Amino acid sequence: MKILVVSENFYPDTFAINDIVRILGERGHEVTVLTGLPDYTTSYIPEEYKHGKNREQVYHGAKVYRVPTIARRHGPIWRSLNYLSFVFSGNRAAKKIDFGEFDIIYVWEVSPVTMALPAIALKKKYKKPLFLYCMDIWPECVKAMGFKEGTFFYSKIKNLSAHIYQQCDHIAVSSKPFFDYLEKVDGCSRKKMSYLPQFASSDMLEKNFEKKPNGHFDFLYIGNIGKVQDIPCLVAAMAKLKDRKDVTFHIVGGGSEYEHAMAMVKEAGAENIVKFYGPKPFKEAMTYYKIADACMLTLDGKNRIGDTLPGKLQTYMAAGEPVIGAINGAGNEVIKESRCGLSVRAGDSDGLANAFLEYIAHQEKYANCGEAARKYFRENFTQEKHFETLEARLKEMINQ
């Protein structure tokens, strides 16, 4: 197949879409990418991408077209300008760039959903089907930004979100609770939706990340550090163990709340047990699993975003790590169904702290959690299963 991918985020920023594009190419498909400028990791555009540089590149055989965008920087105003600039530049590119022959458009939709607007323009121009992979649900995500339901801004975003989703020929959701939300809130037909959970590299299944017991307990968090990850809950739980000499919490990753997270740890007086490492490339980040007894997972439960099945959960499971989380929805269900660890309700910092203590006190009780995690992963979240399902769906859409 010839696939045109539209994603505001792409390499050299670290996102799953990088792997998706690479793997599709390895599986024999011809891939073209329309994206913006890489600024997610640092919030600023790197020098090598300024002033019109590197607007056309090749990534693992895929032709990449980059459109100019305003840097994210910090704060909601700059972030909104960043989002809008991709829509404007992407729509302009849809009109002016000749993308050649392709069979289908694939949108990798994390926030904001507006990144799909250039894809809609391309759909209309080339008369090709539009497939959207939904990992964030809108307008629910704007609640996490502080906009309340019923306000003028929320109602406008709600109408725009519904319009975007309804323009898609098919929507694959990464979490099952998204079915009801998209149907009830955005007016999408259940018939044009399917379930496609995220995947993690199956290579991790063969690696031995097991840490030998040494009397010290190391808990690891790897991934994005943003508002929806409910970092205040995680920090509050970690701080409750600050007087212990046998515990260390390791935080690997970056994001909009990274600086705030470090400030909260300092304010809580927990700097002695919490270590921050910043964002790391995927391969380097994987090495941190070797120091971990268990991995940590939190997600904001104040709205439906908390129903998400976070991609980092699959990665934790592929690494064979026990998982200790404060999460609702699909994530909570998977942890309990797979028996890969301990889970309390989202936002329950006391419960999360007690879960850490429970694991420390009865580590032998959870000795099989890592293998249980990998077993569940093999049955549900492998790369091969993801791409077989994706390819079948795309071919079906092309042949309709």
Regions found by a protein language model. Name each.
Residues 351-354, 358, 365-379:
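A short, well-ordered alpha-helix in the C-terminal region of glycosyltransferases
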Residues 183-187, 191-195, 199-215, 230:
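Acidic anion/phosphate-binding donor-loop and adjacent secondary structure
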Residues 212-229, 235-238, 250:
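Conserved donor-binding/catalytic core segment of Leloir-type glycosyltransferases
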Residues 169, 273, 289-306, 321:
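Acidic donor-binding loop of glycosyltransferase active sites
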Residues 114, 121-126, 152-171:
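Membrane-proximal helix-turn-helix segments that form the acceptor-binding/catalytic region
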Residues 250-252, 259-286:
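Nucleotide-activated donor-binding/catalytic signature segment of Leloir-type glycosyltransferases, i.e.
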Residues 1-60:
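N-terminal subdomain of nucleotide-sugar transferases
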Residues 37, 177, 196-199:
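Carbohydrate-associated surface elements
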